[in-house]
Amino acid sequence: CCGVPNAACPPCVCNKTCG
């Protein structure tokens, strides 16, 4: 979902900073 205009996941998923 990262890099897609309609990204369905929070930015932290792409930044790998979740949790």
Swiss-Prot record:
Subcellular localization(s) per the UniProt record: Secreted
List of residues that carry Glycine amide: 19
One Gene Ontology cellular component: host cell postsynaptic membrane
Disulfide bonds: 1-9, 2-14, 12-18
Tissue/organ expression: Expressed by the venom duct.
Main location: secreted
UniProt keyword list: Acetylcholine receptor inhibiting toxin, Amidation, Disulfide bond, Hydroxylation, Ion channel impairing toxin, Neurotoxin, Postsynaptic neurotoxin, Secreted, Toxin
GO molecular function: acetylcholine receptor inhibitor activity; ion channel regulator activity; toxin activity
Domain of life, source organism: Eukaryota
Post-translational modification 4-hydroxyproline, affected residues: 5, 11
Family the entry assigns: Belongs to the conotoxin A superfamily.
Annotated function: Alpha-conotoxins act on postsynaptic membranes, they bind to the nicotinic acetylcholine receptors (nAChR) and thus inhibit them. This toxin blocks the fetal muscle subtype (alpha-1-beta-1-gamma-delta (CHRNA1-CHRNB1-CHRNG-CHRND) subunits) (IC(50)=66 nM) with 1500/2000-fold greater affinity than the adult (alpha-1-beta-1-epsilon-delta (CHRNA1-CHRNB1-CHRND-CHRNE)) subtype (IC(50)=96000 nM). It blocks the currents completely and dissociates rapidly from the fetal muscle receptor. Has no inhibitory activity on various neuronal nAChRs.
Domain notes: The cysteine framework is IV (CC-C-C-C-C).
The name this protein goes by in its record: Alpha-conotoxin OIVB
